[in-house]
Amino acid sequence: MKQTQLRDYTIKPGQLEAFVRVWKNGVRPIREKRGFVIEGAWTIPTEERFVWVVSYDKPDGFEAAVKAYMESPERKALDPDPTSFIVTQRVVFIDPV
């Protein structure tokens, strides 16, 4: 069953562009290589926020796929670590209507 997450990050002041580069060149391709589909990504520059929607539709399930992604050598090798840019995050599963 396809599961979709909305991920909303507040980024450290002045670091939004740097985070976007790390996300585009590191996070996104690694996620896609592991079977995730990036439905879209947006910035809200006036609020230093990055919002994206990611889905996964394979038998092992979203949570197992996230665990495998986080433990992957590619993710561990990301430098700078994308989480170092994030001040707060809101991550929720969303359903289509």
Labelled PLM ranges:
Residues 4-8:
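Active-site-flanking beta-strand signature of metal-NTP-handling nucleotidyl enzymes
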Residues 10, 53-55:
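Short hydrophobic/aromatic beta-strand micro-patches
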Residues 13:
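Active-site acidic-Proline motif in GNAT/NAT acetyltransferases
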Residues 45-49:
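Short acidic/glycine-enriched loop/turn segments that link adjacent beta-strands
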